[in-house]
Amino acid sequence: MQIFTIFFYALAAECPVERFSEIYYNDRRKGMRLMTKDIKMLAIDLDGTLLHDDMSISPFTADILKKAWTKGIRIVFATGRMFCSARVKLLPLQLGDIPVVCYTGAWTARLESQQVISQDGISPELAGEILAFVRDREWKVQTFINDYAYMAQPDPLEQEYSQYRIRKTIYTGEDFYHPAETVTRMIIVEKNLQKRDNIRKFLEDRFQDRISIVYPERIFIDIHKAGVSKANAIGVLAARWRIRSEQIAAFGNTENDISMLRYAGHSFAVANAEPVAKEAADKTIGSNNEDGVAHAIATILKL
């Protein structure tokens, strides 16, 4: 009890009461009501969260983000997209050379300069094993290396990912199955959700703790190096800025957002989010088409 009391008063001395936010909400993870400190960092997913269904960002959302950035709030967009694809959507916001977490945490780079901050991909050896396993079962797979997409040969299923890509896929034939470089990510597309779940189980049973798998969208199976997640990538940036998890607000809508929703001290799922994301979040806000993220930020930061 004495140790806890000392810690509490030390924290209070560092962060006076008047600096605490007036926002209250029910934290399901702790089963208690919390008073939240001023938010210093926003971690925001793109597709289905910030972006409208037509892939646009509303003027209202752009204005709120600009106000938050001007106020000194650190803004990090965390997406499953390729960096080049995310960059096209985010440059018009004019938020400076901010970090963008891409490939669900496997690649972080600066928005304007394109400087790569970190990469955490699948080794060529492991990638070769996975591709051989996938090939034997005739599953359709795409790899991403140095922000370019690769396939063995053209396939109609490739079009399912085309809306998230601005660079043409590179077809390499037999060489595709023998990568010479680190693979940032692999994607398998499967429209049949039962088959999708079976594929995931086969992969997890075969490769176990050597890979990490998430569903960024209903028909996509993302394969990453074990340990890759949005939370880990965001945590690295937060540590550099000396920002604690309780000072972060995160916004998401799908399974690949769960890690950061659980990591952030304050987490929000949009109304259109999948049930697993809503369960992981502290609160549900307006949908992506209703600018739910922007309205929540405006309330939290009193913009």
Q: What are the functions of these language-model segments?
A:
Residues 6-10, 14-34:
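Short, Lys/Arg-enriched N-terminal segments with co-localized hydrophobic residues
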Residues 55-73, 119-126, 169, 227-239, ...:
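Short, acidic loop-to-helix structural element flanking the phosphoryl-transfer center
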Residues 61, 86-90, 199, 203, ...:
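Hydrophobic packing residues within well-ordered alpha-helices of enzyme cores
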